[in-house]
Curated annotation (Swiss-Prot):
Name the record gives this protein: N-(5'-phosphoribosyl)anthranilate isomerase
GO annotation, biological process: L-tryptophan biosynthetic process
HAMAP family cross-referenced by the UniProt entry: PRAI (MF_00135)
CDD domains: PRAI
Originating organism: Methanopyrus kandleri (strain AV19 / DSM 6324 / JCM 9639 / NBRC 100938)
Keywords: Amino-acid biosynthesis, Aromatic amino acid biosynthesis, Isomerase, Tryptophan biosynthesis
Length: 216
C-alpha cells in the first residue's frame, strides 16, 4: 500500500488530524532560507511532532542549513531540500536519522539538483546512501508550488532507481489516485494540496487524500 506524507505542517492540531486520518509521516519545514508561510523553528517542529503516535514518521525538512539538527529531538527523519551532497547525507544517516533527498523534475522530465541538471550517475551516488528520494516539481518556490510535473518521467525513475521514491508536486485529493496508478511510488507527499489557507491544513482534504491514496 502506498504511504502518505503530509508536509508543511505548522500546528500541532494539524499533525494530530493527519495522524488520525491514517497518514504515515508528517513533515515540518524547519528554518529554511526562503520565504514561506510553512516555515517553523526547530522548537516549534518538536511541538508539532510530539503529538503524533510513535509509528508515524516525523520528518524535518531542511534546506542547505543543518544547524537545527541538534535541536530537533522529536524528528525521526530529515528531508534535504537543497543542494546537499552525498557526504552530508551519509553524515546524517550515521546520526540514526532516515534521510530523504529531494530532486526536482521539470516539465520536460529532466532531473535537477538545485540549478544543476543531473544524470543517472549522480542519482545513483545518492541512492547508495539515502533511504528514499523525493521527486518534486521544479519551481522558483523550491517546493510547495502546487504544480505537478511530468508523471511519466517520475514513473520511469521509479522503475530505474534502487530506493523508495516519494512523489510530490501538485498532488491533491482529486488527482492523487491517478498519480499513484501512473507512477507507482513508494509514497506520496502533499502540502498545499490539503490546505484551506497557506500553512493551515484542511481536515477534510487530509482525510480524503489519505483515502484516495490507500484505495489504489
Amino acid at each position: 500500500m502506498v504511504r502518505v506524507k503530509i508536509c508543511g505542517i505548522t500546528r500541532p492540531e494539524d499533525a494530530a488530524t493527519a495522524d488520525e486520518a491514517g497518514t504515515d509521516a508528517v513533515g515540518c519545514v524547519v528554518e529554511v532560507p526562503v520565504s514561506t508561510p510553512r516555515k517553523v523553528s526547530a522548537e516549534h517542529a518538536n511541538e508539532v511532532f510530539s503529538v503524533v503516535s510513535p509509528f508515524v514518521s516525523r520528518v524535518a525538512v531542511l534546506m542547505d542549513n543543518l544547524e537545527p539538527i541538534d535541536r530537533l529531538e522529536e524528528a525521526t527523519a530529515v528531508q534535504l531540500h537543497g543542494t546537499e551532497d552525498p557526504e552530508t547525507c551519509e553524515e546524517l544517516s550515521e546520526l540514526g536519522l532516515d534521510v530523504i533527498k529531494t530532486f526536482w523534475v521539470d516539465q520536460r522530465g529532466s532531473v535537477w539538483l538545485g540549478e544543476e541538471l543531473i544524470g543517472d550517475e549522480v542519482l545513483a551516488e545518492y541512492c547508495e546512501i539515502v533511504d528514499a528520494v523525493l521527486l518534486d516539481t521544479k519551481s522558483a518556490e523550491g517546493g510547495g508550488s502546487g504544480e505537478r510535473h511530468d508523471w511519466d518521467a517520475s514513473a520511469r525513475l521509479v522503475r530505474r532507481l534502487d530506493v523508495p521514491v516519494i512523489l510530490a508536486g501538485g498532488l491533491n485529493p482529486e488527482n492523487v489516485r491517478e498519480a499513484v496508478e501512473k507512477v507507482r511510488p513508494y509514497a506520496v507527499d502533499t502540502s498545499s494540496g490539503v490546505e484551506k489557507e497557506p500553512g493551515i491544513k484542511d481536515p477534510e482534504a487530509i482525510a480524503e487524500f489519505v483515502r484516495a491514496t490507500k484505495s489504489v
